[in-house]
A protein has these predicted regions:
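Conserved beta-loop-beta element that borders a ligand/cofactor-binding pocket
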Residues: 15-25
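Alpha-helical segment proximal to the catalytic Tyr-Lys
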Residues: 10-11, 77
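Conserved active-site helix of classical SDR/Rossmann-fold NAD(P)-dependent CH-OH oxidoreductases
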Residues: 1-6, 10, 17, 65-66, ...
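C-terminal helical subdomain
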Residues: 21, 43-79, 84-88, 112-113
Length: 113
């Protein structure tokens, strides 16, 4: 999808058509809550998910909507061929050694018997 957006941006740029995309990360959507409700311990699963996020929280979908609104605004007229990642920093890199997950040794990443 990213390369398609870039190619379309090149193809249509001279016509003043901008092509961008948004790549969302974990969000507080209905699907997220269905997944949580199906868990044995929803509170623990949510805490684990939030702990994995560099910002420490699962994001509200409104943040994606706000990003799209900005990209549509005149203030973003110079943006084209861009992928804006709204994931709370998850894809920027993450140190899993500092995350407590049941059955995993945080120092080595290996499972415990």
């Amino acid at each position: 999808m990213r390369q398609l957006a870039r190619t379309a941006a090149l193809d249509y740029g001279r016509d003043r058509i901008r092509v961008n995309m948004v790549s969302p990360g974990p969000m507080l959507t209905d699907l997220f809550f269905i997944h949580m409700d199906a868990a044995e311990d929803p509170a623990a699963l949510r805490a684990t998910r939030e702990n994995r996020q560099p910002l420490g929280e699962i994001l509200d979908p409104q943040l994606v909507a706000n990003t799209v609104l900005f990209m549509l605004a005149d203030e973003a007229a110079g943006m084209t061929g861009t992928d804006v990642v709204v994931d709370g920093g998850l894809t920027a890199g993450f140190d899993y050694r500092n995350v407590s997950m049941p059955g995993v040794d945080g120092r080595t990443g290996s499972g415990s018997a």
